Structure formats: structure tokens, C-alpha cells
Amino acid sequence: MGAGKMGSFFIDLLSFEHEVAVFERDAKRMRFTYNCQRFTTYEEIELFKPELLINAVTLKYTIPVFKEVIPYLPKECIISDIASVKTDMKEFYESTGMRYVSTHPMFGPTFANLQQLSEENAIIISEGDYMGRIFFKDLYQKLGLNIYEYTFEEHDKTVAYSLSIPFVSTFVFAAVMKHQDAPGTTFKRHMRIAKGVLNEDDYLLQEILFNPYTHDQVAQIRTELKELLEIIDNKDAAGMKGYLTKIRNNVKRDIEIK
């Protein structure tokens, strides 16, 4: 469902080993899809009788599209999503009576090199259909992804940390930045990140930040900024040295500091 960036990625990934069809209301978006059937009506899906349906539409429409298409699916069909935010998904899935599997490829096409994913991660929700989980585990392993299994709740806690902190940091950078005719390397790198984040769907950004676990993460940023501003205002050299030592120690498991 959906022929956007991730929908097209899954079509390319699956179409040479499986019989694949793509549904997209806007037929023009399917112009560059290959080796698959192209549908624009739910009746075509009904005749196709899919064994697995991957919902790759914009986050805002994930559940509404499920509600529309489920009446046209075989009872044994596994329904699945790849949404970045899983709020309300567990309750929805359990209300349908359908087999389901939920995953989150954490390498959106905005930043990742889709030809080289060995440094990227994917989450498979541990709740749901066993065979569906096995299918996606095999698929993601073939891509060389690092795979983690979380419950719906654990997933949303992870997303609150791994997405909200960099997103909010980018928002702050974009809010205060001024155009630079001759930007330095660090500035240009931040600009590239800002370009990627700010080109994301507004609803996706909103839902990530409205995640119930996000507030405490953002509050931590505010606390750190307050401490750093006090050090700057006081020109506290010892305090700055201590602060730099603290943050280097905080990231030493993930970043090599020379």
C-alpha cells in the first residue's frame, strides 16, 4: 500500500522473489515501479488475494487505510506496517481479528544509502504473528540490518530517545541559524541534517514529538542547555573543562574520541 519512497523500496526488494502488487490512488506515482502489478482500486486487491499486506502510506493515513482495505482481504492475510510511531497500533491490530506484524526499518531513505545498510537498524515488534515476524527477520537479515525485537511500548520509548533528541536539536539549529556565504564544515554538516529532517512529513514529525515518552527526553536538553549557558555566562573555564569531560565520557561507547 503506497508507492512512496519506502513503498517503492519494498517493491524493489520483494518483486524478484515474490508476486508483488502495489496499490496507489494516484496512478502517476506508480510510473517508476517495475516487476509488479499496479492497482488503483480495492476490488483489484480483493481479486489478487494477498498473503501479506505491507502498509507503507504516510503515517497519518496508516490506520485509516487499514480500515478501508481490510474488508477486501482474505481472512488469513497478514497485515503489517512499517510506521515510525506505533501509538495506538497494538489496540488497532487486536481489534481487527487479523494476523499482523509490525516493524520499523530505522533507515528512512532521507539519509540512508539503501545499497549499503549494514550499519542501519530495524525493529521487529515481538507481539503479533510468528510467521510474519520470521518473514521480516529473514528479509532484514538479507539486507545486513542489525535487528532488534521490542514490544510496542519498548519501541515507542526507543523512538522517543533516538528520534526526538536529534529532531529537536535540529529544530533549534534551524530556528536560530543565519545564512552563511562561507560556512564551515561543521555548519554544512548540520545543514545537511536539517535539510533531511525538515523535508520529512509534518505529521510524522508531530507524532514523534507527541509520543508520550518524548517530553522527558526534550526536558533533558533544556537542563543541559541551562547548565551550559551558566558556564558560558560565567566564563567558567574549569566548569567548561568538566562539562566537556562529562559529555565525552557519555558518548565514549559510541564515538571514538582522540
Give a label for each model feature.
Residues E149-K258:
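An accessory alpha-helical subdomain
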